[in-house]
A protein has these predicted regions:
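Short, low-to-moderate order helix/coil transition modules at the start of elongated helical scaffolds
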Residues: 1-207
Length: 207
């Protein structure tokens, strides 16, 4: 036998929805902090890449001078030194290219994550509105029921029903908005998942 559903059950649902709102807001804030950290990481990585490029320019200058000296048999420069430096330059060029792709992937991800957090907050706000209106419509229903039990006259009864219908209409509108916000939230989350895949694919060996 199914339990009897009471008005209190729906009021409890509204209270629980408010708890979900609170947790959504907390998660959004935590994700904002993480986004800021990822932005800072990308910024520091870009600075390191710039230094690496400057290092390569210096290495190329050294090699150019070494190659000039190699023409002199009595110079203290060996072919092995030049070859080793050339290998370092070649590897550094590869690291710069890989890191640039990685930095771009992080930037794209953080931009989408900012939009995702925005949609999460909109979802939370819409859910909060639904919880408020759910509670209001139930309390209004209880009030109307109480008045009906007092056998109020016809005109007052019509007014009570009209008032309740207004509350119900407000709730229905809020719920429609919530459903729309949930769909938007899920859509952006799927887009974010795709960007995580791109970020993962951009990771390669980099010293």
């Amino acid at each position: 036998m199914s339990p009897i559903i009471t008005h209190e059950d729906e009021l409890e649902l509204a209270r629980t929805e408010k708890e979900v709102v609170s947790q959504l807001k907390r998660l959004a804030k935590a994700q904002n902090d993480l986004i800021n950290s990822q932005k800072k990481y990308a910024e520091n990585l870009a600075k390191a890449n710039l230094v690496r490029e400057m290092l390569n320019r210096s290495f190329r200058d050294v090699i150019k001078q070494m190659q000039t000296l190699l023409r002199e048999k009595k110079s203290n420069v060996q072919d092995e030194e030049v070859n080793l430096y050339q290998d370092i330059i070649h590897n550094n060029d590869g690291y710069v290219e890989v890191n640039n792709k990685y930095i771009d992937a992080i930037k794209n991800l953080t931009l989408k994550k900012e939009y995702f957090v925005e949609k999460k907050n909109e979802f939370a706000d819409a859910l909060s509105d639904v919880a408020d209106k759910r509670s209001a419509v139930i309390k209004k229903a209880l009030s109307v029921e109480k008045m009906k039990n007092k056998l109020v006259e016809g005109e007052k009864l019509k007014k009570l029903d009209a008032d309740f219908n207004d509350y119900q209409r407000d709730f229905d509108i809020a719920r429609d908005v919530l459903i729309k916000k949930i769909h938007q939230f899920l859509e952006v989350r799927n887009e974010l998942d795709d960007l995580w895949t791109i970020l993962k694919d951009s990771v390669s060996k980099s010293s």
